[in-house]
Amino acid sequence: MATRIRLRRMGAKKSPFYRLVVADSRYPRDGRFIEELGYYNPSTTPATVKIDEEKALKWLASGAKPSDTARSLLQKQGIMARFAEIRK
């Protein structure tokens, strides 16, 4: 199973927020997922990001590949840097 860390769109029309989830790469964007890692709300000023670092590191260590946007959010939270330290 090829797992991906990606954003799942939620919220009302024209006012989205996103949940950061781990899902099989074959599932649809807003479909079934394995585990929720956090959320991202771009509508607030500044944008709200909350990610469970321990869960994210566990999934990265087990081989989950983040999407481009998810990778950007993980880098801003410092999780990708911590993952790189752990891997060395």
Swiss-Prot record:
The keyword Ribonucleoprotein applies. Coiled coil: none annotated. This is Small ribosomal subunit protein bS16. HAMAP family: Ribosomal_bS16 (MF_00385). Keywords: Ribonucleoprotein, Ribosomal protein. Belongs to the bacterial ribosomal protein bS16 family. GO terms for biological process: translation. It comes from Syntrophomonas wolfei subsp. wolfei (strain DSM 2245B / Goettingen). InterPro entries: Ribosomal_bS16, Ribosomal_bS16_dom_sf. GO terms for molecular function: structural constituent of ribosome. PANTHER family: 30S RIBOSOMAL PROTEIN S16, SMALL RIBOSOMAL SUBUNIT PROTEIN BS16M. Pfam families: Ribosomal_S16 (PF00886). GO terms for cellular component: cytoplasm; small ribosomal subunit.
